[in-house]
Amino acid sequence: MKYSDFKKKVVDWPIIFSRDVVSRGKSGQAVRNQLERWKKSGRIIRLKKGVFILADDDRRVGLSRPYLANQLYGPSYVSLEYALGYYGLIPERVSDITSVTSLKTMKFANAAGTFIYQHVKLKAYRGFVLVEGDGGLKFFIAEPEKAVVDFLYLNLEKFKVDDPDIFEGSYRFQNTEKLGAKKIFRFADLFENRKLVKVASLFSKYCSLKLGGA
């Protein structure tokens, strides 16, 4: 396959899987070898084994990193620090795309960024929604309350059950009035962890104090 033919076929694809490029009558290995040559020449960018995007000059579709995060490893949904920044619950927007998965913990670093996946048990793998991002590309992201609970659980060793100041002092949580206490408790219960439930309760009290002082 010539590069011009390949580009014509995939120019509107937001992500390219090598398995989708195999032409009738061509072996998978031949396609993989060809993709490797185009990668070395800079025409395509490798995100992980068998997964690529076109280089910036040739790509017609915008780059949506949350969408890529869903596609690179899954099942997964965007959560933790990136989701907290997305919802404005912390002041900074995080550059790394942080996600939760029911699979093992994983990390990919490539030209599109750093994609971090943290494991939670299957029972706790819920509380996410499908949203539309850049270029109309849809991706799964935690609900605001689930992003908080995922963050608390996966950083549980850093929290005490009697120190509400840490939420504002160390992590600078903000805009917490939009969060629902019942949802926070419901999501925390999924993890079946006593300390998490206590920390989630402390966080809810912190939110109530902030709301009362507003």
Please identify what each model-predicted range represents.
Residues M1-P75, A111:
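Short beta-edge/loop segments at beta->alpha junctions of small alpha/beta modules
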Residues S18, L80, I184:
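Generic structural marker for isolated residues within well-ordered, non-membrane alpha-helices
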Residues S27-G28, I90, R194:
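Short coil/loop linkers at secondary-structure junctions
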Residues V31, S76-L80, P144-V148:
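Amphipathic alpha-helical interface surfaces
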Residues W38, A83-L84, A188:
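Hydrophobic alpha-helix position signal
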Residues R46-A55, R65-A124:
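Short gly/ser-rich loop at a beta-strand->alpha-helix junction or flexible surface loop bordering the NTP-binding
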Residues G62-L63, R126-F128:
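Short small-residue beta-strand/loop micro-motif enriched in glycine and branched aliphatics
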Residues F128-A214:
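Hydrophobic alpha-helical interaction segments
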